[in-house]
C-alpha cells in the first residue's frame, strides 16, 4: 500500500486546525453543537495515534512531525482545557496540574533533545493521554449536550485520574534531567 509521505504531517496539521472549530461549536452552546464539538475532538484525538503509527510503520518520520506532533497535542489539550475552565464548572486543580505538567515536560523535552537524551513514551504516559482526551471529550459533551445527568461527574473523575497519571509520568522527564541539575 502506498502512503503519501506527508500524511502523518497532514494529520498533525489537521489536529491544530480543528481546534478553533471545536471551540466555536462549544460556544454555540446547544446540544447539536456540543455533540459535533465532542465528535471533532475525538477525531482530532484519534489522529494523535494515527500520525505516529503511520510515520513509524511506513518510515515516514520527519523532523517536522517530531517537533509539531507534541505541540499539536499540547495545543489541543490545552485549548480545550482552558475553554472548559472558562465556560463550564470544571474543577481547576486537575486542569492546572495537567497544564503545568505539559508545559514543564515540553521544556524538559527540548532540553533533553539539546543534550541528546531520549526519554521513550511509556505505556502509562499513553494511558494518561488517552484518559485526558477521553475525559475532555466527555466534558465537552457534558450533561448539556448529552442529556445524561451525571456525565459531567464521570468526566471529572476521569480527569482527576488523568491528572494523577500526569504527575507520575512527568517524573520520568525530571529523572532523566537529574544529572544536569
Curated annotation (Swiss-Prot):
PROSITE patterns: CDP_ALCOHOL_P_TRANSF (PS00379). The keyword Lipid biosynthesis applies. One of its GO terms (cellular component) is plasma membrane. Gene3D superfamilies: 1.20.120.1760. It catalyses: a CDP-1,2-diacyl-sn-glycerol + sn-glycerol 3-phosphate = a 1,2-diacyl-sn-glycero-3-phospho-(1'-sn-glycero-3'-phosphate) + CMP + H(+). GO terms for biological process: phosphatidylglycerol biosynthetic process. It is found in: Cell membrane. Its EC number is 2.7.8.5. Keywords: Cell membrane, Lipid biosynthesis, Lipid metabolism, Membrane, Phospholipid biosynthesis, Phospholipid metabolism, Transferase, Transmembrane, Transmembrane helix. It is an enzyme of class 2 (transferase). The keyword Plastid does not apply. It comes from the Bacteria. It is a multi-pass membrane protein. InterPro entries: CDP-alcohol_PTase-I, CDP-OH_P_trans, CDP-OH_PTrfase_TM_dom, CDP_ALCOHOL_P_TRANSF_CS, Phosphatidylglycerol_P_synth. The chain crosses the membrane at residues 8-28, 35-55, 64-84, 148-168. GO terms for molecular function: CDP-diacylglycerol-glycerol-3-phosphate 3-phosphatidyltransferase activity. Pathway: Phospholipid metabolism; phosphatidylglycerol biosynthesis; phosphatidylglycerol from CDP-diacylglycerol: step 1/2. Belongs to the CDP-alcohol phosphatidyltransferase class-I family. This protein catalyzes the committed step to the synthesis of the acidic phospholipids. This is CDP-diacylglycerol--glycerol-3-phosphate 3-phosphatidyltransferase. It comes from Rickettsia prowazekii (strain Madrid E). The lineage of its organism: Bacteria, Pseudomonadati, Pseudomonadota, Alphaproteobacteria, Rickettsiales.
